[in-house]
């Protein structure tokens, strides 16, 4: 009996030594693999390959410029805790295939919408072309440090922000694209363009903030501008914008009084006239024979009475009439309505700018900000919009420092927080397409064909169509004081509708400022280029569903003493 016991004891001792040895070998092997992986990952992170593979969690948390490849070039980014970018980039990742949105659970749907908003695949802003490498300071001279404290900005032709990736060349490219001569950088993340230098030069030491995206380069300070000349554009940069033909118009009675600047030259061309007016920062170049005039839109020359282009023709066989002129839009922005600020005192009336997603809320904010001169706020935070100049995005939505607050929320509690609201309504067919494009391709992109053909599109329509209806119905029911604005009316009759909106906001606006807004009505928020998907995306079943919601909303508007929906909404 004792002999088998001793054999068992001997076997167990050997097993203990064997397990201890295997455990030590396993730990050593794992440590070696981790060290090897760390050595390989570091040079890969520094090389920043063109095809993105992963994003730091910190980048995802910020929600600004998520899919911009340049954010991976920062060697200080944490290499651990990485997320798969393909997962972030894919619209299907936002809602897994097979999962249908609950029709009745509106709060759940809105939470999903807000989550997708911060992971917008939109690239860098329109005014910030991709920088292909580090800043090249030889392309433009550094002109010094300037102060614009206590005075109106001189460099205000174009403005954009980038809290994480601003560089000198980034700003220079943006200004060059719009034919400006000078690029000024402020507070490490702000870029201003113009053709005149600020008047007050200060010590170079006062421009002491590094560029957010370029260590070692100075990008001004608070109310201090590091100013560079733009110089020649680099290969791969966006081409300079050219003059855009606006039409043929009658010459005003008093040309000298109406047009601020002029030049006469033999064989005058559009390029020469546009360049002359751009240098003087005028948005309009007017051409008549050998005469070139520069001007702003005014009540005397409002660009609303265009005539047949043959009356302005320069061809010998047509011989245009002397009382008409050709008008071109220069690349320069009309600066009479670009200055914006926060409200000097907290607003006593808390106003919402409410709409269904895809109904043109961002465009309406652009119009309101430039018409009133005050920033608009947002219930959400969208870094892409902040980079395009919506400074109110960073302000807390309940600060009451903005003229109104963007929201897509509905439901009694959310609505009754506001004292009044502008309710922006758009044709649901167009709203659904616009929001689907934004979800799949960003604010200015188009959803690829594969998204339209997938299950995602019918699931999107089934859930979001009912939200379009419930959003309007809730605001009509619980809103304390409303102004109903239809997107189509705002586009077709911009100045009268916008005048009604600013009056509702209790702001006095001059006619010239409204004309300035009309002259730059699109801003940077319209999708450019040809739509890649021109086929009818709505099936008969989808149309039956949407048409039912249209009838419901149309009747609700009439029941609340508002005009019904525009005729183009109502199914025939």
UniProtKB/Swiss-Prot annotation:
It is a single-pass type II membrane protein. Residues 139-231, 242-337 form the WSC domain. It catalyses: a ganglioside GM1b + 3'-phosphoadenylyl sulfate = an 8-O-sulfo-ganglioside GM1b + adenosine 3',5'-bisphosphate + H(+). SMART domains: WSC. One of its GO terms (molecular function) is sulfotransferase activity. SUPFAM superfamilies: P-loop containing nucleoside triphosphate hydrolases (SSF52540). Pfam families: Sulfotransfer_1, WSC. Keywords: Glycoprotein, Golgi apparatus, Membrane, Repeat, Signal-anchor, Transmembrane, Transmembrane helix. Residues 1-14 are cytoplasmic. Glycans are attached at residues 105, 254. Disulfide bonds: none annotated. It is found in: Golgi apparatus membrane. Residues 36-572 are extracellular. Gene3D superfamilies: P-loop containing nucleotide triphosphate hydrolases (3.40.50.300). Changing residue 360 to A: Markedly decreases the expression of Neu5Ac8S epitope. GO terms for cellular component: Golgi membrane. InterPro entries: P-loop_NTPase, Sialate-O-sulfotransferase, Sulfotransferase_dom, WSC_carb-bd. The chain crosses the membrane at residues 15-35. Belongs to the WSCD family. Sialate:O-sulfotransferase which catalyzes 8-O-sulfation at the Sia-glycan level using 3'-phosphoadenosine 5'-phosphosulfate (PAPS) as a donor, forming 8-O-sulfated Sia (Sia8S)-glycans. Displays selectivity toward glycolipids such as GM1 gangliosides. PANTHER family: SIALATE:O-SULFOTRANSFERASE 1, WSCD FAMILY MEMBER CG9164. This is Sialate:O-sulfotransferase 1.
């Amino acid at each position: 009996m004792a002999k088998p016991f001793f054999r068992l004891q001997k076997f167990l001792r050997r097993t203990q030594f064997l397990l201890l040895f295997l455990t030590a070998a396993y730990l050593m092997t794992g440590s070696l693999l981790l060290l090897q992986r760390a050595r390989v990952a570091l040079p890969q992170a520094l090389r920043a390959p063109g095809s993105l593979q992963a994003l730091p969690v910190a980048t995802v948390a910020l929600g600004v410029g998520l899919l911009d490849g340049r954010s991976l070039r920062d060697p200080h980014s944490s290499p651990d805790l990485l997320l798969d970018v393909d997962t972030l980039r894919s619209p299907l990742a936002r809602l897994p295939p097979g999962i249908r949105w609950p029709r009745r659970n509106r709060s759940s749907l809105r939470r999903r919408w807000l989550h997708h908003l911060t992971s917008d695949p939109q690239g860098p802003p329109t005014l910030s072309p991709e920088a292909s490498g580090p800043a090249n300071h030889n392309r433009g001279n550094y002109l010094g440090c300037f102060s614009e404290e206590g005075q109106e900005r001189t460099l205000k032709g174009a403005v954009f922000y980038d809290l994480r990736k601003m560089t000198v060349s980034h700003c220079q490219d943006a200004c060059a694209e719009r034919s400006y001569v000078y690029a000024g950088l402020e507070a490490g993340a702000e870029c201003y363009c113009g053709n005149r230098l600020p008047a007050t030069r200060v010590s170079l030491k006062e421009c002491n903030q590094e560029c957010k995206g370029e260590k070692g380069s100075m990008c001004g300070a608070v109310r201090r501008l590091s100013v560079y000349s733009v110089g020649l554009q680099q290969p791969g940069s966006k081409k300079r914008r050219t003059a855009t033909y606006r039409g043929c118009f009658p010459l005003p009675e008093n040309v000298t009084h109406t047009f601020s600047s002029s030049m006469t030259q033999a064989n005058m061309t559009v390029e020469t006239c546009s360049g002359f007016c751009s240098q003087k920062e005028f948005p309009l170049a007017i051409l008549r024979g050998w005469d070139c005039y520069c001007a702003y839109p005014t009540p005397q020359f409002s660009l609303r009475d265009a005539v047949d282009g043959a009356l302005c023709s320069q061809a010998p066989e047509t011989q245009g009439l002397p009382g008409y002129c050709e008008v071109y839009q220069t690349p320069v922005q009309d600066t009479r309505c670009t200055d914006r600020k926060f409200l000097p005192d907290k607003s006593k009336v808390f106003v919402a700018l409410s709409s269904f997603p895809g109904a043109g809320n961002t465009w309406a904010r652009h119009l309101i900000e430039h018409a009133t001169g005050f920033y608009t706020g947002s219930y959400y935070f969208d870094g892409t919009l902040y980079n395009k100049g919506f400074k109110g995005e960073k302000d807390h939505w309940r600060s009451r420092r903005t003229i109104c607050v963007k929201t897509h929320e509905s439901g009694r509690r959310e609505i009754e927080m506001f004292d009044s609201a502008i309710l922006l309504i758009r044709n649901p067919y167009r709203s659904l397409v616009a929001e689907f494009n934004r979800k799949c391709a960003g604010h200015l992109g188009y959803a690829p064909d594969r998204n339209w053909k997938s299950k995602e599109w019918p699931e999107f329509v089934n859930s979001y169509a009912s939200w379009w209806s419930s959003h309007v119905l809730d605001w009509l029911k619980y809103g304390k004081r409303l102004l109903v604005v239809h997107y189509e009316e705002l586009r077709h009759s911009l100045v009268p509708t916008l005048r009604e909106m600013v009056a509702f906001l209790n702001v006095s606006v001059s006619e010239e400022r409204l004309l300035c807004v009309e002259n730059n009505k699109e801003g940077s928020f319209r999708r450019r280029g040809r739509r890649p998907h021109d086929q009818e995306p709505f099936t008969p079943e989808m149309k039956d569903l949407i048409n039912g919601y249209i009838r419901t909303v149309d009747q609700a508007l009439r029941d609340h003493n508002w005009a019904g929906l525009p005729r183009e909404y109502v199914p025939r």
